[in-house]
Amino acid sequence: MGASGSKARGLWPFASTPGGGGPEAAGSEQSLVRSRARAVPPFVFTRRGSMFYDEDGDLAHEFYEETIVTKNGQKRAKLRRVHKNLIPQGIVKLDPPRIHVDFPVILYEV
């Protein structure tokens, strides 16, 4: 839990040279990378939603229903979490866009 960076190995999507090499790698390898790969923007414009719609069309992270339990002649209300008939929210547009987690830039230095 926690890390949401990419686990793939290979070319760094934001680098101009493969593997972040020095000046010696700036020659033919750089032109090869540019011709194969397209420019990747450092921003993320959408994300997967974390909420759900229920049968009534309500949107929330979790849904509960109230059930009445009779124990020793006393009625007691309990909340039971609903897991069925929930529809994921889908793709959510981010406003403003966020910086990609793999973008190599220092935002704040002490």
From Swiss-Prot:
InterPro entries: FUS1. GO terms for cellular component: mitochondrion. Residues 1-33 are annotated as: Disordered. Keywords: Lipoprotein, Myristate, Phosphoprotein. Transmembrane segments: none annotated. It comes from the Eukaryota. The modification Phosphoserine is found at S50. Belongs to the TUSC2 family. This is Tumor suppressor candidate 2. It comes from Mus musculus (Mouse). The lineage of its organism: Eukaryota, Metazoa, Chordata, Craniata, Vertebrata. The gene is Tusc2.
